[in-house]
Amino acid sequence: MKRVQTAEEREREAKKLRLLEELEDTWLPYLTPKDDEFYQQWQLKYPKLVFREAGSIPEELHKEVPEAFLTLHKHGCLFRDVVRIQGKDVLTPVSRILIGDPGCTYKYLNTRLFTVPWPVKGCTVKYTEAEIAAACQTFLKLNDYLQVETIQALEELAVREKANEDAVPLCMAEFPRAGVGPSCDDEVDLKSRAAYNVTLLNFMDPQKMPYLKEEPYFGMGKMAVSWHHDENLVDRSAVAVYSYSCEGSEDESEDESSFEGRDPDTWHVGFKISWDIETPGLTIPLHQGDCYFMLDDLNATHQHCVLAGSQPRFSSTHRVAECSTGTLDYILERCQLALQNVLNDSDDGDVSLKSFDPAVLKQGEEIHNEVEFEWLRQFWFQGNRYKLCTDWWCEPMTHLEGLWKKMESMTNAVLREVKREGLPVEQRSEILSAILVPLTVRQNLRKEWHARCQSRVVRTLPVQQKPDCRPYWEKDDPSMPLPFDLTDVVSELRGQLLEARS
């Protein structure tokens, strides 16, 4: 079954096509630091972009952070993700790992990543290697540092905006420290917008990726990451990035003036105003230990891309992930809400329900879908990658699967009820109307996830990274109250609903 694009995807694709049509065979202009107008353009059009050269960052971090990157790479902890783009599975050219607050997740391109926890107070994490534990500690230390720097940058931005000053962009230099005095409420707001709860680590060796796409609008060269807005972030929250390109990249690009445009041997980050063909884009070279910050609404109003250099590169991208529906505590609470409708459950797994109120049943089936498709299948689709670093998620996922299995029995109890003789026709119709949509969604998504686990892309993955279609069971499995394939169940429900309405 061909997937139908969402309205947002269709609009985005239409904008892209219109932009390419307007360009025809010409490139949009973009600026590099060697261009005379570069800093003026930055000041006028990109004032919420802050850059810090490596020399202004503590030397201790420059020693520890690269060691942490290399440690995780050595232990094979970074993975290319199989993401979903316009209904197709695509293997990312960049390898990633998510580190952050215990129980947090971060979703991008329809893929939910689960944190390898960093060692925060009050949480015991058992790592598979002492070196991995030390690396996670380092990224927590980097996170704390970047959080302080971000708050200071936001304070300075607030002062400049309040004074309506046309300040020189905060780049290639220390942040100003004086003359800043926000109110208590403002200070709380600034801290919340810099309260980084995860970092998404990235790695790519461009020499092993000969098929990288060309940047389509400006002619900037090979892209490691295409134009995008970072997803799933708290509104107006900042993003901080620490960049580390491996040895060799600096020596090869001493004289950038010999190039027209950006030096293709040096990694760059590119920025543009979304869907704007008038304002020149910016490309900023990224050398070892450089950092940049996207403040306030910059991530919403502008797009950015990462332009590949010639050497391998790591980055640590610190974010305030929007976790209102993305933490372990959240999904456990949702499960408990659904299970409140269980009256009795027997030793054989059968259950009876307290209420057959249509709204209660609908809510229960929607939670059933949420835990299955947003958590269990997302987790197991990524194979056994998380066990390489820690067993932290093993017990919670086993527990979630047990709760999900009880919800299967709850669905079975509802199906028994709609077949019960003597059930008033109107009540039967209301129950069927409440559960038919979530069960149809469940059937369609199970079919989709099962197909994804056998797609051409995943067949190329190493054994440890291959997706596990879980939960999955055969038709006659005595431990399961309902079949995996709900085609017949959904068809029967539709027939019953038509009969009840006739």
UniProtKB/Swiss-Prot annotation:
GO CC, any one term: nucleus
pH effect on activity, per entry: Optimum pH is 5.5-6.
Phenotype upon changing I367F: Alters protein structure and causes an increase in whole body metabolism, leading to a lean phenotype in adult males, but not in females
Residues reported in the UniProt entry to bind Fe cation: H228, D230, H304
Example GO biological process: DNA alkylation repair
Subcellular location: Nucleus; Nucleus speckle; Cytoplasm
SMART domains (alphabetical): FTO_NTD
Binding site for substrate: R96, Y108, H228, H229, D230, E231
Outcome after substituting I367A: Reduces enzyme activity by about 60%
GO molecular-function term, one example from the UniProt record: mRNA N6-methyladenosine dioxygenase activity
Enzyme class: oxidoreductase
Keywords linked to the UniProt accession: Acetylation, Cytoplasm, Dioxygenase, Iron, Metal-binding, Nucleus, Oxidoreductase
Chain sites annotated for binding 2-oxoglutarate: N202, Y292, R313, F314, S315, T317, R319
EC number(s) on file: 1.14.11.-, 1.14.11.53
InterPro entries: AlkB-like_sf (IPR037151), FTO (IPR032868), FTO_C (IPR024366), FTO_C_sf (IPR038413), FTO_cat_dom (IPR024367)
Reactions catalysed according to its record: a 5'-end (N(7)-methyl 5'-triphosphoguanosine)-(N(6),2'-O-dimethyladenosine) in mRNA + 2-oxoglutarate + O2 = a 5'-end (N(7)-methyl 5'-triphosphoguanosine)-(2'-O-methyladenosine) in mRNA + formaldehyde + succinate + CO2; an N(6)-methyladenosine in mRNA + 2-oxoglutarate + O2 = an adenosine in mRNA + formaldehyde + succinate + CO2; N(6)-methyladenosine in U6 snRNA + 2-oxoglutarate + O2 = adenosine in U6 snRNA + formaldehyde + succinate + CO2; a 5'-end (N(7)-methyl 5'-triphosphoguanosine)-(N(6),2'-O-dimethyladenosine) in U6 snRNA + 2-oxoglutarate + O2 = a 5'-end (N(7)-methyl 5'-triphosphoguanosine)-(2'-O-methyladenosine) in U6 snRNA + formaldehyde + succinate + CO2
Tissues showing expression: Ubiquitous. Detected in brain, brain cortex, hypothalamus, cerebellum, liver, pancreas, heart, kidney, white adipose tissue and skeletal muscle. Most abundant in the brain, particularly in hypothalamic nuclei governing energy balance.
Fe2OG dioxygenase domain: region residues: 32-324
Assembly and binders: Monomer. May also exist as homodimer.
Family: Belongs to the fto family.
Protein name (Swiss-Prot/TrEMBL): Alpha-ketoglutarate-dependent dioxygenase FTO
Species in which this protein is naturally found: Mus musculus
